[in-house]
Amino acid sequence: MYAVNPIECIHLKDEYDTCINKSIFDKDLKITKCHACNDESENWICMTCGVVSCSRHVNGHAGEHFENTKHPISASFSDHSFWCYTCDTYVHNTPLFDICEILENIKSSNKKDKIVPKKDQKEEEEEDQVVPSASITTSSTTTSISKQTTVNNTTTTSSSSTTTTTTTTSTTINNNEEEEESESETDESSSEGEESLSLIQRMREMIFGVGRGPKIVAPSEQEESEEDESCVLKKPTIEEIAKYINSAKCKNIIVMTGAGISVAAGIPDFRSPKTGLYEKLDKYDLPYREAIFDIEYFKKNPKPFYVLSKELFPGSFNPTTVHYFIKLLSDKGLLLRNFTQNIDTLERIAGIPANKLVEAHGSFATSHCVSCKKEYSTEYVKERIFKDELPECTETSGCKGIVKPDIVFFGESLPSRFNDCAREDFTKCDLLLVIGTSLKVHPFASLINFAKGCPRVLINFEEVGTNPYGGFKFNQPSNKLDVKCIGDCQTLVLDLIKLLGWENEFNQIVKN
């Protein structure tokens, strides 16, 4: 999953409507078994017809399904990637962003179903009394959910109905006949809602918990919400962001970072002609360049990955301005969390506390045998790599497995800490800073969707993340909270430090 930039194939452009059918998610997908062998370990869903099949690493029924149907695009339930069988590569496109959220929701829902004990009937009836109220209409799904609350011994029942363009809400108080009628309608609406519950809404509930996180409100409530939001920033500029950070209102800052913050440290990127890391791998005749980050390919041929690792291994690079800025935020008690895609451990070297750090794609800091899971030191792996030897498992008798740094590959799940912190942190976020990332790798990229009602700042070489599914609203007339700073992220962060008046403290951190 790390550093993969899937292509936009023709099937996601000219043939999107033919190949992608979102209605496949309307059916019950709580159990994602292969349709042919019932295996549950690693399955893909056909984005055209919704058939669930196992991967080539199990029994290969997904490939057989393609041969029989010629449906090109499938999505992974494991890592939420998309594969085009016709183009024979990983693919992605902006309209697939919301499908990533749906896949994450299904995965989270299945995991939760396995670990949560079954409640008795009385508990379920009690919970039914506090289900959040919401109505959502999308291009393919209409959802109605009822809400019943009791305030000062007075029961208020609200029922919501939706069409494709409007949402109306009616409320009846202290009228028994109307309450009974409304409750009857609510029961019917709730029943229908349970059958066709919007998967995106379920995604939010899984990440944030019921009754928490971004709220879905009626238009009148939305107007009030926007008025409240407009008080945070007078206008969406970096100068206003600096004032906001220095105010008492900003207490919990989340920073999302990508490879762009480490380029200034001398770490080469992947795709630059002649100098990019991928150029050095051409001689290994990879099936596709990103195969070096495929766990099954690694098990068969780990050498290309270790050639690449020599260019990235920690110890040869120093933190950058951005890393030390995040450290300063932590020292000032403003950093809630730093979610990073980087595997270079420069955040650790800069002194960002471990409890403030989420290495979403893992790192070189620890390593394990892919066969027996025995942990090995970074020094052991580094010594073998720089001797051009494969780091084999030596401490488990007869194992001889390959020792791999704990970097997340395709086919591997993100660290549990990623989901745990995302669920907890984004309900508290006062400010989101997104620095040096292309926002193309999911589910990391979709995190920006969950920073609701607070300022969001993009500091990047180019504008990214402006998708219609919760992305930045830089160029929209309604934008009051999203700020973009386009250019070199090191220079732009230095400018922000000056606006904040933190130059002396920053210089002291760098000096130390």
UniProtKB/Swiss-Prot annotation:
Q: Kindly list the positions annotated as binding Zn(2+) 2.
A: 34, 37, 54, 61
What residue spans carry the region label Disordered? 113-196
- State the similarity comment: Belongs to the sirtuin family.
Q: What is the official name of this protein in its record?
A: NAD-dependent deacetylase sir2A
- Disulphide bonds annotated for this chain are none
The task this protein performs is described as: NAD-dependent deacetylase, which plays an important role in the regulation of transcriptional repression.
Q: Could you state one GO biological process linked to this protein?
A: autophagosome-lysosome fusion
Entry's EC annotation: 2.3.1.286
Keyword Membrane, does the record have it? no
List the gene name: sir2A
Write the record's keywords in alphabetical order, separated by commas: Metal-binding, NAD, Transferase, Zinc, Zinc-finger
Q: What GO cellular component is one of the record's annotations? A: nucleus
Write down the required cofactor(s). Zn(2+)
- Catalysed reaction equations from the record: N(6)-acetyl-L-lysyl-[protein] + NAD(+) + H2O = 2''-O-acetyl-ADP-D-ribose + nicotinamide + L-lysyl-[protein]
Query: What class does this enzyme belong to in the EC scheme?
Result: transferase
CDD domains, alphabetically?
SIRT1 (cd01408)
Q: Does the keyword Zinc apply?
A: yes
- Bias category Acidic residues: which stretches? 176-195
